[in-house]
């Protein structure tokens, strides 16, 4: 599935956005449930990570630099210079400084359709999700190594190099002797 979880349903029919907070929280919940054995949600979590979550992170800012400069976003007027505290606000290299942040309300095909801005909660929660994703790619215990998510990961036991979605190949380079098991997603044929 895509991993698009709308933040508002019903009250604003033309508003179709998913906060990175929503997507991050849903991924973390799926990982925690799968990790604890309360359900097999590995496929869902990996699908949501690959499809919508990675696209929520701002890595390419060239499109922002091409936008016409605006002094205000509708509904968010710029404060008068007399109330700007330069200890907390600046307009110096803002685009360069927001690389790595997350979309506050993205649609499946638009990074910012309704609100062109950054919110601290989305960036914080999404980075917390990256931690849980990273931790759950591999699980090591007592000489046994389990690959749960077919995503790239380096560790002292093994490196996982995923070529998905470009090819159906995942390489695991073993660095220490381990009993290796790899969880096969439901979409992998048994033949």
Question: What is the meaning of each model-derived region?
Answer:
Residues 1-191:
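Glycan-recognition and catalytic cores of secretory/periplasmic carbohydrate-active enzymes
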